[in-house]
Amino acid sequence: MLRDGNEGMSTIPGFNQIQFEGFCRFIDQGLTEELHKFPKIEDTDQEIEFQLFVETYQLVEPLIKERDAVYESLTYSSELYVPAGLIWKTSRDMQEQTVFIGNIPLMNSLGTSIVNGIYRIVINQILQSPGIYYRSELDHNGISVYTGTIISDWGGRSELEIDRKARIWARVSRKQKISILVPSSAMGSNLREILDNVCYPEIFLSFPNDKEKKKFGSKENAILEFYQQFACVGGDPIFSESLCKELQKKFFQQRCELGRIGRRNMNRRLNLDIPQNNIFLLPRDVLAAADHLIGMKFGMGTLDDMNHLKNKRIRSVADLLQDQFGLALVRLENVVRGTICGAIRHKLIPTPHNLVTSTPLTTTYESFFGLHPLSQVLDRTNPLTQIVHGRKSSYLGPGGLTGRTASFRIRDIHPSHYGRICPIDTSEGINVGLIGSLAIHARIGHWGSIESPFYEIYERSKEVQMVYLSPSRDEYYMVAAGNSLALNQGIQEEQVVPARYRQEFLTIAWEQIHLRSIFPFQYFSIGASLIPFIEHNDANRALMSSNMQRQAVPLSRSEKCIVGTGLEHQAALDSGVSVIAEHEGKIIYTETNKIVFSGNGDTISIPLVMYQRSNKNTCMHQNPQVQRGKCIKKGQILAGGASTVGGELALGKNILVAYMPWEGYNSEDAVLISERLVYGDIYTSFHIRKYEIKTHVTSQGPERITKEIPHLEANLLRNLDKNGIVMLGSWIETGDILVGKLTPQTAKESSYAPEDRLLRAILGIQVSTTRETCLKLPIGGRGRVIDVRWIQKKGGSSYNPETIRVYISQKREIKVGDKVAGRHGNKGIISKILPRQDMPYLQDGRPVDMVFNPLGVPSRMNVGQIFECSLGLAGDLLDRHYRIAPFDERYEQEASRKLVFPELYEASKQTANPWVFEPEYPGKSRIFDGRTGDPFEQPVIMGKSYILKLIHQVDDKIHGRSSGHYALVTQQPLRGRAKQGGQRVGEMEVWALEGFGVAHISQEMLTYKSDHIRARQEVLGTTIIGGTILNPEDAPESFRLLIRELRSLALELNHFLVSEKNFQINRKEA
């Protein structure tokens, strides 16, 4: 139980703190622990000994900056140097040198690592904690069978089972079960020691017969029996030292390694006092586990809940990096051992520099960050996405679960999750419940458990202390919920309050309360904490909102929300998109790309991000927010980033919405918008695409970047400079050349037809020795070139080619087909853009900006959007911003309604507009049809809502083709927008054509215009020379494909012609 220093006060910890603490723990402890495990290495003759002196290792500051690493596609890492010594045992001479072990990727201020120029982040994994767990299952006869499962540190399982006759069996890796006395004897205990150290010796002596007693009468017999069962070998193995070593290596060192966490859990569960440094399974553990299992059979003890968080552990970034570092050192050990033996064999004098190479460590970390499932590319769609990504927790990954095998019970919410893992924020689809998000106050403890803070309540004292509790501790306390979440400490507590105790929710007297929650948002993640009035929403819609806020596109002109929750400031601050003053000073001058200020006697220049592309093609940009000559304080915002205004998160826009049907254009989650959102650039966003080309050295020669491209129109090359690269500021259309490149090819005259060679000889045309492989702008990529980067190769190696990257910016207004969403799970697709004069308008003449379907509210139970809409209207008229904590119903009933209506009433009084608050239908107003000027029949809910534009945009999804590529084997059109793919006319489309009786059109769709190869060619020739298009005689390729697939299933499909005269069957070949 840990106490915080500030009594009675709590601040929200940094959202990136978990990543920072994990990496610091790896640097401070993990590196040293693994280096101390590095053994002394000797040659085969034991004449030379190599060892590392790990006490004085050094990590060197990186030579490049973060921006340069991203720009040049390098890894932002630190070099690790360790003193090493080589000792000649015969002469007692020692040669000591500081050797370079390798590069360790560092963590930047965002909690991420830069590997090969890409921001990557390591997410936390939730695993079953090592130890022993008891459970009960019913067999086929309906009788309870008790088992104890021992889980090792790496995830291996061994089971103890007690049957109906009270016999205890052991099972390793789901193999055949053996008597518990066999592994106990094989681990070094004789029968007398076993009987002296158990509570139920009569049960251990009851079931072995004389034949079985011989198996564990001695340690050798027990080892042979255990090896025969464990290794599944036939015959009678012979006892030997090699057999003991193999068993020791394969079983006792791998499957019986508990680790420090497993040793602690085993001691607590079985009431043992084995030292913490003994991390392997001992015979004493096995006997105590069997004793406890017998007690379970007799009704003593409690079963374990495998889904309780006290039985889980977090595998953080520190553990993963330490595991990889240990793996790299094992590889380095093998390299050093092989190099020493090779040097002695060739009679060379080795040195520590010659023995150690940096390849194992560097390649291990590169493969880890590039291939490991828990190492992911940082999602940088908007600032919220960056900080949420690092707080994810996953049950998936090596040693964990899979999306197809995880049960519903594992995915479900558990009472121990409260205050630790958000019960709302999870992914949708097959991974639902398996990928969660940590609560905002949660932290990872020393033993890998998720801890949550509480206020400790004293009966005789009014002082309050904050304590952090692990899941195994807080279930023994009465934890108050409900009104104990009150922000105001002076509120008089009621006599009876709701509380949580031992995974149950009770209502008890206030005097019995031990702990209380510290914050209303304590149970939620960052995404869920940004939803106002979340208590009025269905949890499924809150889940959708948490995910959709991470998909919001940064707009060209951001606007902070009128109705918020108060966490917007810290979310923007911890995201790192804003520039914060590190100390006091005075601004000397500001430019669009840098801020220069003086402080502490130094002049500091801070570079700003200028139109930087994120990995989701959104635009990251920083704008100075301070003026020349102004004095600044430490912590003040110097420049705002994308989707931030005034240091607060600003993902969307406050626009005027109405909930009403409009000619069916907003049915089924469709949304009707005004053209003001288009022409006023309300939802305009910038997107930056990257196009890349590399030059290689081929077998015919090197590829060339040039402007002189033969056989191409000059119009396509108009934007290239003299080097053949597109110029900055050029406007590029689809099909234009971005980089001109020629690839050499061999010219063989024999490959041409005789008439071609004759024509070339007459006209004097030279055979081309190059082919054009230019970088062309694909469909949908039109825009303005904002940056060109030519990364030159170093050292002239053909394996490190030159790379040219072209960045093109697109300005996208909102259009039909784009996806918009609110913060309450209310999402929709733009169906129509109306002129502003046709939109419904209010009584003061203002036209509505967006029209939602009112039927989408009651069935989905996300009523929070109605409160936000009405309160946003009042805030817009009163020029106020509201920051509302959730669960305000704890103060009184209808608290949210009592908050909104007085604000509407005040806005109505101050603006002299009685329609803002009408007592007959509060929150609603009569609005008018913009086309006719007539009022609608019923009053309509309207107000200001905060609406986001999501990254699912029609420009990235719409696709069509008239002709394109076909698969070579199946002759079917390719699939996907990236391959310029298409679709066949399907079954339902054929039904539609049949319904209209258009037989010829239907035949064309299935033959000429589809995959009938010969018919397609005949149509082309007939169209050129004229004539009648003949009907196809044979089947199209799709029918042939069906026959081939049936043949692959051993089904032969033939067709026959039956004669009408004699009914003889004449077979015709297909």
From Swiss-Prot:
SUPFAM superfamilies: beta and beta-prime subunits of DNA dependent RNA-polymerase (SSF64484). PROSITE patterns: RNA_POL_BETA. The keyword rRNA-binding does not apply. Its EC number is 2.7.7.6. Keywords: Chloroplast, DNA-directed RNA polymerase, Nucleotidyltransferase, Plastid, Transcription, Transferase. The keyword Transferase applies. It is found in: Plastid, Chloroplast. One of its GO terms (biological process) is DNA-templated transcription. It holds the Pfam family RNA_pol_Rpb2_3. GO terms for cellular component: chloroplast; DNA-directed RNA polymerase complex; mitochondrion. It catalyses: RNA(n) + a ribonucleoside 5'-triphosphate = RNA(n+1) + diphosphate. It is an enzyme of class 2 (transferase). GO terms for molecular function: DNA binding; DNA-directed RNA polymerase activity; ribonucleoside binding. Signal peptide: none annotated. In plastids the minimal PEP RNA polymerase catalytic core is composed of four subunits: alpha, beta, beta', and beta''. When a (nuclear-encoded) sigma factor is associated with the core the holoenzyme is formed, which can initiate transcription. Belongs to the RNA polymerase beta chain family. DNA-dependent RNA polymerase catalyzes the transcription of DNA into RNA using the four ribonucleoside triphosphates as substrates. PANTHER family: DNA-DIRECTED RNA POLYMERASE I SUBUNIT 2. This is DNA-directed RNA polymerase subunit beta. It comes from Chloranthus spicatus.
